[in-house]
């Protein structure tokens, strides 16, 4: 639930509210603060889907925070030159599902977090062609690779998902018309089922007490392109119909929130094992 937005001397605050925890985040100055605080505590994060519209913005956010970032991409053509040349960026050019088990284990080795921004291209081939289980299979293989390494620390896994996917742990209420539409999407549009299955893998196979992997599945509403970070609201479940009145979430806000999850332990503790929904204010 959203508690409130406060304007104070050109500083805009957003308030995240969970039944027992409230956090205020300075949206205009936060990135500078984060970069200063975490420069001495740099983490390594693996990002898959980094060449996509949201993945690029996430990578930029992480690098601005002084973090070390590894990306697995088929091509760097969609990435800005200043990102590709950044001293804290490591690029692995490969198709993630073509990597061997040993290569996958090597790439996730020593990573503190993994973020998946994978998705299907919005074309006929992208929607109906192979691989139909891109997000699910990548999630499963990345988690298996983490476990294969037997890390001595808990690894964070952040999955970019969708408000069209329900958190079945919470038995979220959905109207009958929406259930009908979602059922058709599940049968007729492979990427929707893929998104559902990927989140279900984290929810049921990794669960709440894995000991090696902790996870968050981030559910934005309809994605938009905006030039700057703006206030957002964060909720445990959708507050509006994902089909008939979805609302908007800018890609830069999604990247910002996922970067916050990786680098802010208090925010991570608030949402781990959950599927937070984010909307633009």
PLM regions with names:
Residues 68-74:
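Conserved glycine-rich Rossmann-like NAD(P)H-binding loop of the short-chain dehydrogenase/reductase
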Residues 44, 53, 241-281:
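Mid/C-terminal beta-alpha module of Rossmann-like enzyme folds, strongest
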Residues 71, 80-141, 145-148:
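NAD(P)H-binding glycine-rich loop region in Rossmannoid oxidoreductase-like domains
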Residues 199-225:
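Conserved beta-loop-beta element that borders a ligand/cofactor-binding pocket
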Residues 45-65:
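N-terminal Rossmann NAD(P)H-binding glycine-rich loop of SDR-like oxidoreductase domains
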Residues 141-190:
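Conserved Rossmann-fold NAD(P)-dependent oxidoreductase catalytic core, especially the SDR/UDP-sugar
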Residues 129-136, 175, 187-197, 247-252:
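Short-chain dehydrogenase/reductase
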């Amino acid at each position: 639930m959203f508690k409130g937005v406060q304007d104070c001397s050109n500083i805009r605050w957003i308030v995240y509210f969970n039944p027992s925890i409230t956090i205020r985040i300075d949206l205009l100055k936060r990135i500078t603060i984060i970069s200063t605080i975490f420069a001495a505590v740099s983490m390594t994060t693996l990002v898959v889907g980094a060449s996509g519209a949201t993945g690029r913005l996430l990578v930029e956010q992480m690098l601005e925070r002084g973090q070390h970032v590894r990306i697995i991409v088929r091509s760097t053509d969609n990435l800005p030159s200043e990102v590709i040349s950044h001293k804290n960026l490591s690029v692995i050019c490969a198709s993630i599902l073509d990597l061997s088990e040993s290569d996958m284990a090597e790439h996730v080795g020593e990573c503190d977090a993994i973020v998946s921004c994978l998705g299907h291209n919005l074309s006929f081939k992208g929607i109906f062609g192979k691989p139909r289980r891109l997000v699910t299979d990548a999630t499963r293989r990345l988690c298996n690779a983490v476990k294969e390494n037997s890390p001595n620390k808990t690894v964070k896994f952040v999955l970019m998902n969708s408000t069209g996917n329900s958190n079945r742990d919470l038995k979220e209420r959905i109207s009958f018309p929406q259930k009908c539409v979602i059922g058709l999407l599940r049968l007729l549009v492979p990427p929707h089922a893929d998104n559902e299955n990927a989140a279900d893998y984290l929810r049921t196979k990794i669960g709440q007490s894995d000991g090696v992997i902790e996870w968050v599945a981030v559910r934005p509403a309809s994605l938009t392109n905006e030039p700057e970070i703006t206030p957002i609201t964060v909720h445990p479940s959708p507050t509006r119909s994902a089909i008939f009145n979805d609302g908007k979430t800018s890609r830069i806000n999604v990247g910002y929130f996922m970067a916050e999850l990786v680098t802010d332990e208090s925010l991570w503790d608030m949402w781990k094992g959950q599927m937070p929904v984010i909307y633009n204010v």
